[in-house]
């Protein structure tokens, strides 16, 4: 699985905050890392505005000492170790962006908030990484960021623009002159199909004792038809659970479930879903003549 043509297989994931990667892609990352694929995570902020679920660490939060960033960086290190991923980076690390908080909050207006970042500038920084790593596959969020968080929306914008810039000749600055353009072959957006959300809710309801709440609304779900790929990495479920547990300021993990600060329980699943947002034209698969839904891909590198 480690080779694709003349270059090693490389997977790049772009996320907004520490913990997003473990929630959306933890099993996927562990599977590909174990198979010898070069897996790289780029995190756009260190989640300074995150709610702290551990009472004894609440003083680190933005409303108190505002020292959560360094702590969450350590949690991210531990999560990556659990997943077997050795290359994880902070976007524009020397002048990094700050967590913008939820949409409409005062933290959106912080001078360093990612929401206020210049998309072209941030995209150039990410394009530099793309040219360096030369990934065939890029994973990020869809246009709404999954649930409308400003940093998720901005991560989508930056990742998509960076993929464009990385493939264009003449877009390198002085520090990139030695790096040739690179065209990402496939871009996927994370998604959470409605049927998977229902299965999670059903599993939680069947628990006789749980500290977690049920939520039937699940604002981040998509129609099942939106998913074009499912990665079954159930063999790496323990690694995903360990990675989630590493983000202890942000979530509670108990048995087969986890919950963020809203205490809504979600099943820790080894199946993770994706929507193919872009595919290099020579790799595109034609629609079936009868317009039947095509089978889901089972490999992000399918066709490469």
Swiss-Prot record:
Keyword Magnesium found: no
Gene Ontology biological-process entries: mycothiol biosynthetic process
Enzyme nomenclature, EC number: 3.5.1.103
Xref: Pfam families: PIG-L
Keywords: Hydrolase, Metal-binding, Zinc
InterPro entries in alphabetical order: GlcNAc_PI_deacetylase-related, LmbE-like_dom_sf, Mycothiol_biosynthesis_MshB
Free-text comment on the cofactor: Binds 1 zinc ion per subunit.
EC main group: hydrolase
MF terms (GO), sorted A to Z: N-acetylglucosaminylinositol deacetylase activity; zinc ion binding
Catalysed conversion reaction: 1D-myo-inositol 2-acetamido-2-deoxy-alpha-D-glucopyranoside + H2O = 1D-myo-inositol 2-amino-2-deoxy-alpha-D-glucopyranoside + acetate
Binding site for Zn(2+): 17, 20, 152
CC cofactor: Zn(2+)
Keyword Ribonucleoprotein: no
Recorded superkingdom: Bacteria
Xref: NCBIfam families: mycothiol_MshB
Family listed: Belongs to the MshB deacetylase family.
Biological role: Catalyzes the deacetylation of 1D-myo-inositol 2-acetamido-2-deoxy-alpha-D-glucopyranoside (GlcNAc-Ins) in the mycothiol biosynthesis pathway.
Name of this protein: 1D-myo-inositol 2-acetamido-2-deoxy-alpha-D-glucopyranoside deacetylase 2
Organism of provenance: Catenulispora acidiphila (strain DSM 44928 / JCM 14897 / NBRC 102108 / NRRL B-24433 / ID139908)
